[in-house]
Amino acid sequence: AYELTKAGIPCVLLEAGPHLTNEDYVNDEWEAFGQMAWLDGRATSGSWRVAKDFPDLPAWIVKAVGGTTTHWAGATPRFKDYEFKALSTYGKLEGASLLDWPISLEEMEPYYDKAEKALGSTHRHGRPPLPANNNYKVFANGAERVGYKFYATGPYATNAEPYDGRPASVQDGFNFQGDKQKSKWSTLVREIPRAIETGLCELRADSHAVQITHDSSGKADAVLYLDAEGNLHRQAAKVVCVAGNSIESPRLLLLSASSMFPDGLANSSGEVGCNYMRHLTGSMYARFEKPVHMYRGETMAGIIADEQPHNPSRGFVGGYYMETLALGPSFLASFVEPGAWGEDFTEMMDAYANTAGMWIVGEDMPQTSNRITLSDSSKDKWGLPVANVNYDDHANDVSMRTYAYEKAEALYKAAGAIGTHRTPPYPSTHNLGSLRMSELPKDGVLNRWGCAHDVKNLFVSDGSVMTTGGAANPTLTIVALAIRQAEYIAKSLNAGDL
C-alpha cells in the first residue's frame, strides 16, 4: 500500500484483526500470544508432527494490523541464484512438484536492495551489526571449532543504532511479542503509517474478508468483508491484492467460488491451495555447566550459512541455515518436547539458565498433496468452512532434518555441551506456496508479477506466491516481491491495462 500511495494510487487496507500498536504489546510470552496470534479455528491432517502436537494450531501467525511482520524475529538472508531454479538444479524428485520460478535472482537483486534499505538490514548497505549476546557467543564458538566459516550476527531487520525513524534495540528479548521499542522493522511501524500519511490510504481493522467478487468478464470488482459485529460490507476495487498468509489467502479464493469459477476463484489449474510449504525446521537446545542466559538480547542473534549451499553428497538436495533462538521458560516448557513430563523434562527445565538454543530452517520440497482445503466439518464463528492444512514431510525433508540435528549436536558438543535435545518443529511461521507463481498457467495460480493467470486484476502479495521455498527466511523476499509488484501495478494502472 505504501508503494502504491507513493505513486498516487488510493488504497483501502482490510485487516481481519484489531489495530494493536507497539504501546499495546506486553513482554509476556503467553499473554502476547493470546493478544496477537491468529486463533480462529483451523484443522490439520497428514503425518507431520505439528498435526499431532498442535492439531488446532498448524501455524503461528498474527491477526492484527501489521500481520506476522510484528511477530517475526527479523532474519533477512536472500535467496541464492540456484534456489530460483529448483527444478533445473535438483532435477525431478519422486513425490516433489518442483518448478523453476518465472523470475531470476538477477531480476530480483534491485528489489532486494530496496527491501534491505527499507527494513534496515544489518550487515547490508552500511548498516552496523547487532551486538553478540551469550547465545550467539556459544553458537559462534561451536561454529569455529567444527570448521564453519560463514557465521555472523545477522543480517537482521532490527536496528543496532537509530535508523529511518526507529531507535536502536534495547536488547530486551521480546521480538516475537511485537517489539514495544519499534527497533524491529514491521509494516505496522513503517509502511502502514506512511501510507496513511499520504492521505491516500484508509485502514479498516476488524474487517474480515470473506469473498472476492467479479464482474461478467471475470475481473475482480469488490471484496465482501465482515466487521467485528458480523455486518457484511462491500468494498469496490479496480485491483484486489490478497495478503492473508499462505493459509488464509487460498482459503479466501476457495470461498470465492462462483458459477464462472466453480472450483474457486483463479483456480482453473486446480492448483489453488496446493504446494503448501512451511520450511524444514527443528530446534536444538544444549545444556552447559555454566550459565548462558540465552534469553538476554535478541530472540534471534546469529546465523550460520555453511550448510545452506546445495550439496547432494549429504544425502538431500537444497540446504539449511542454523540460527540462534531463545525461548523464555514458559514457551520452552510448551515447545521443547510437546507433551513431555518426568525426569528428562524437568532436567531440561532446571537447566534453563545454562541452556543455549538454535533453530534449523531449510528448504522443504513442494508436494501437490501438501495443500490448503476447506474443511468439510469445521466452521468459523461466521459459519464459513475453516482451512484444513494437510502436510507430510517429503523423504528429502526427513534426510535434511536428521543431518541437521547431527550437525547441531556436533556444534554444541564442540563448545562443551553436557547434554542436547532435538526439539520437533513448532507451529509454522514460514508459510509459503499454496498460490505459486508459474510460467505456464497449468502449473500454478499466478504469473511472474503475482497476478492470477485467470483474473487479470487479482494479485497475491504474500508468501503464497513462492514457487519453491529456498532456505532463507522468507520476509525479505516477500517484501522485495511486493515492491516489484506494486511498481508493476502502478505502471499498469497508469497505462490503462488494469
Predicted features by range, described:
Residues T468-E487:
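A conserved FAD-binding loop/helix module that cradles the flavin
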Residues A7-I9, A16-F79, P110, A140, ...:
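N-terminal FAD cofactor-binding segment of flavoenzymes
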Residues D53-W60, V65-T68, R78, E83, ...:
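FAD cofactor-binding and catalytic pocket of flavoenzymes
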Residues A152-G154, S169-N175, D179-S183, A205, ...:
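A glycine-rich dinucleotide-binding beta-alpha-beta segment and adjacent secondary-structure elements
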Residues E3-E29, T198, S207, Q211-H214, ...:
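Glycine-rich loop(s) and the adjacent beta-strand/alpha-helix scaffold that form part
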Residues M36, A64, T70, T76, ...:
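N-terminal export/assembly segments and adjacent metallocofactor-ligating motifs
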